[in-house]
């Protein structure tokens, strides 16, 4: 694949104009910034012309940071979008891909958008709807699949409907709380999560019901809908899925996350993922061939069940009785320590080649 891509990279071929959109209104704003910086650093400047677009915490679109080195975590401080000059994307299909300043002058007319946005208002189908209205090609999954993938309730319902193995959970809406019957069914420990969140933000592990109120309050700070999951005893595993340019799918080697029981959170939390300078996974996971093949097969089935496009990362617990699906991430992290680029590197597809595939797939879908 890399030979075919490089063959197109001749001096007379115009560069592909790519808008990298990052930041956003979600609690994963800073993770998105780091992902965007890593992507910009790996895009071949001979092949791509990059136009960064940042979205502030307040949702304002602005000309983004063009220096990837300024979108890194330094001394445990993560970057944020800094406002410079407001821009907006045309929603008129006759001017598809036009990014304009407030005075109507053109910032760029791009060929494709790479929305490196994590969490709500970026990974949940909202911005994908904007791209559909605009008519501009974009990397990743469409409106419905993004919305379902973002919402853990509907992810699990779709997985279960396809006969895929999922764990026990209870959904709480509004002011609802667990009943005594729920508590008996779930047992302890349980994990309390915002239903539409990621990067382990707002998640608590409850080992005693005296911890319940605090855990529920924390989750509701991030979402009015909360999912309470029975703990699954097993190792955490992540597997990447990539849609090739011809539409065929491939699954990466799986990664096994290191045991985090000794940590303060008791699970694979935000600090472990993004701030602590530690090795967090065994890649490839040390499973036998049969277990590895089953994880890859289930990852592809999950991707298809949600009608995903382009890419996804599928998370599992592997128990003594086999893999159990946990969730699917339709725009996984692309930070230097994110699992998605790492598992494909171990599969034989480097970071730059991975980006080439995703952009080409978006342009031809």
Swiss-Prot record:
Its cofactor is Mg(2+); Mn(2+). Pathway: Cell wall biogenesis; peptidoglycan biosynthesis. ATP binds at residues 183-238. It holds the Pfam family Dala_Dala_lig_C. It catalyses: 2 D-alanine + ATP = D-alanyl-D-alanine + ADP + phosphate + H(+). Binds 2 magnesium or manganese ions per subunit. It comes from the Bacteria. Mg(2+) 1 binds at residues 315, 327. Residues 156-360 form the ATP-grasp domain. Cell wall formation. Belongs to the D-alanine--D-alanine ligase family. This is D-alanine--D-alanine ligase. It comes from Corynebacterium diphtheriae (strain ATCC 700971 / NCTC 13129 / Biotype gravis). The lineage of its organism: Bacteria, Bacillati, Actinomycetota, Actinomycetes, Mycobacteriales.
């Amino acid at each position: 694949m890399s030979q075919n891509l490089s063959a197109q990279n001749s001096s007379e071929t115009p560069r592909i104009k790519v808008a990298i959109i990052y930041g956003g209104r979600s609690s994963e704003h800073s993770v998105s910034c780091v992902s965007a910086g890593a992507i910009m650093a790996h895009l071949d400047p001979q092949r791509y012309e990059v136009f960064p677009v940042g979205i502030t915490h307040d949702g304002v679109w602005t000309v983004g940071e063009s220096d990837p080195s300024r979108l890194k975590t330094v001394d445990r401080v993560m970057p944020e979008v800094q406002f410079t000059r407001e821009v907006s994307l045309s929603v008129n299909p006759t001017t598809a891909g036009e990014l304009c300043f407030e005075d109507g002058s053109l910032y760029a007319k791009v060929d494709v958008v790479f929305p490196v946005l994590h969490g709500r208002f970026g990974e949940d189908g909202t911005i994908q709807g904007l791209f559909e209205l605009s008519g501009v090609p974009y990397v990743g999954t469409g409106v419905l699949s993004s919305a379902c993938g973002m919402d853990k309730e509907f992810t699990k319902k779709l997985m279960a409907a396809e006969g895929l193995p999922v764990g026990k959970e209870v959904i709480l809406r509004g002011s609802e709380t667990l009943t005594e019957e729920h508590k008996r069914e779930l047992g302890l420990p349980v994990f309390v999560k915002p239903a539409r969140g990621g990067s382990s933000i707002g998640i608590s592990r409850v080992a005693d019901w005296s911890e319940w109120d605090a855990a529920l309050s924390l989750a509701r700070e991030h979402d009015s809908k909360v999912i309470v999951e029975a703990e699954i005893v097993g190792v955490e595993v992540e597997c990447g899925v990539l849609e090739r340019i011809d539409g065929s799918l491939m699954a990466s080697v799986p990664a096994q996350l290191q045991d985090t029981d000794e940590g303060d959170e008791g699970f694979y939390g935000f600090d472990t993922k993004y701030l602590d300078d530690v090795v967090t996974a065994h890649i490839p996971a040390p499973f036998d061939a049969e277990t590895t093949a089953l994880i890859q097969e289930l990852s592809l089935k999950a991707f298809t069940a949600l009608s995903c496009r382009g890419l996804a990362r599928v998370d599992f617990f592997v128990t003594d009785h086999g893999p159990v699906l946990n969730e699917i991430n339709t725009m996984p992290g692309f930070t230097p320590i994110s699992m998605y680029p790492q598992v494909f590197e171990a599969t034989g597809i480097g970071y730059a080649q991975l980006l080439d595939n995703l952009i080409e797939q978006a342009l031809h879908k």
